């Protein structure tokens, strides 16, 4: 279904929007989903026209598969498309770690940060540490 949606969006000449694919694989790993399956999925979606990927994890650096790399790093290995990561990003250290691994082009802030009434000041303090 995802492939059909991406293909339909890209076929419309009147719509020139980038397409992001937001996904998680953690529920599939128990069913035998392997790195080769992720590679095939990403390649198929890239060929359909996905412009960037948004791998989802409860925590941005959650490990997966046998060598314990995070999902964002696996995605970066298999795709040259830009990546958005999210998931409990509450410190500059996490941003630096993801950037050092080369597995994040953009970062999405966790919704819990917006529960803080002074979220902007909180974020500013964190970034200035």
What are these regions, as identified by a protein language model?
Residues 1-129:
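Flavin-dependent oxidoreductase catalytic cores
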């Amino acid at each position: 279904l995802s492939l059909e949606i991406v293909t339909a969006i890209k076929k419309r000449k009147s719509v020139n929007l980038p397409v992001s694919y937001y996904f998680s694989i953690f529920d599939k790993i128990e069913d035998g989903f392997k790195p080769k399956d992720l590679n095939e999925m990403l390649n198929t979606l890239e060929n359909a026209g996905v412009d960037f990927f948004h791998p989802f994890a409860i925590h941005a650096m959650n490990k997966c598969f046998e060598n314990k790399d995070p999902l964002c790093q696996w995605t970066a290995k298999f795709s040259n498309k830009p990546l958005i990561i999210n998931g409990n990003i509450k410190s500059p250290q996490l941003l630096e770690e993801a950037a050092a691994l080369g597995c994040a082009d953009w970062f999405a802030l966790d919704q819990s940060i917006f529960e803080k009434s002074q979220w902007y000041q909180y974020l500013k303090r964190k970034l200035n540490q």
